[in-house]
Amino acid sequence: MLQNHKLPKSISAKELNELIKSAKKIQIVDVREYFEWEICHIEGALNIPMNLIVESIDKITKEITTVVMCHHGVRSMNVIHYLESIGCKNLINLEGGIHAWATDVDKSMSTY
């Protein structure tokens, strides 16, 4: 049986780059594994692997907009559904994840 989940709000890599440049207070949570983070990451992002979200929930600032990201945008969408289920708001999924960032914003970034 399929659960009735609405798709989370999403943002493109280029839109996220503009948001970062605007100096609006946001938080970026990267839910990829540590070894993926070591390959490449967005400067200033917080790395909390998906399997550690529950025990690391206190590291997420709930009062500001949080962009959740992963490699391509699937894990981050699942994390957003969990965070919404426990009452978190102002969550945005990075469409295409770090791959989109490397392709559309920072072409010098390593990819995998």
Positions of the model-derived regions?
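Rhodanese-like catalytic fold shared by cysteine-dependent sulfurtransferases
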Residues: M1-Q27, Y34-T65, V74-Y112
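Short, surface-exposed ligand- or partner-binding patches at beta-edge/loop junctions that are enriched
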Residues: M69
